[in-house]
Swiss-Prot record:
Pfam families: HTH_Tnp_1 (PF01527). Belongs to the SyrB family. One of its GO terms (biological process) is DNA transposition. The lineage of its organism: Bacteria, Pseudomonadati, Pseudomonadota, Alphaproteobacteria, Hyphomicrobiales. Keywords: Nodulation, Plasmid, Repressor, Transcription, Transcription regulation. This is Probable transcriptional regulator syrB2. InterPro entries: Homeodomain-like_sf, Transposase_8. Residues 11-23 have a biased composition (Low complexity). It comes from the Bacteria. Residues 24-35 have a biased composition (Basic residues). The keyword Transmembrane helix does not apply. Seems to affect the transcription of cya3. May be negatively autoregulated. Residues 1-61 are annotated as: Disordered. GO terms for molecular function: DNA binding; transposase activity.
């Protein structure tokens, strides 16, 4: 308690530290950068989109044939052959799908007179063989029943 009444020594203790520095000014920050405005992404190539083009059936068949020959010769891959033909992969597969049914219909031909006669003869032989097989199986079943004593 004696120290509390002695205020002079405190003043003397504070006096030597009178050179206490004022708090340093805070470092100023630079203003925040604004967020970058997202620009819409463009296509990889800066060229304008290709104008839709119509190909005739003959042109389509030629391009498909060109692609097939390039691939079968082993010169390029299918993807590269399609690009070199100047069409997209989707177009290639659509064309290929539409050409196939037409070719399949063309491949089917009607049988001639000789072929019809052969077909009729084969069908008659087939019927005769089926009857023989059925008779043989019936006889075998009857024989087995007799042996087992079921009949």
């Amino acid at each position: 308690m004696a120290d509390e009444s002695n205020t002079g020594s405190i003043a003397a203790a504070v006096a030597p530290n009178a050179d206490v520095k004022a708090p340093a000014a805070k470092k100023k920050r630079s203003p925040r950068r604004q967020k970058a405005v997202a620009e819409p992404r463009r296509a990889v190539s800066e060229t304008p989109a290709a104008k839709p083009r119509r190909y005739s059936e003959q042109q389509r068949k030629e391009k498909l044939k060109l692609i097939e020959t390039q691939v079968t010769e082993g010169k390029v891959t299918l993807k590269d052959a399609i690009k070199s033909a100047g069409i997209s992969e989707q177009t290639y597969y659509q064309w290929k799908r539409t050409v196939k049914p037409v070719e399949q219909k063309a491949e089917k031909r009607l049988p001639t007179g000789e072929e019809l006669a052969d077909l009729v003869r084969l069908e008659e032989e087939n019927q005769r063989l089926r009857k023989l097989l059925a008779e043989k199986l019936r006889a075998e079943n009857a024989d087995l029943r007799k042996r087992l004593g079921l009949d």
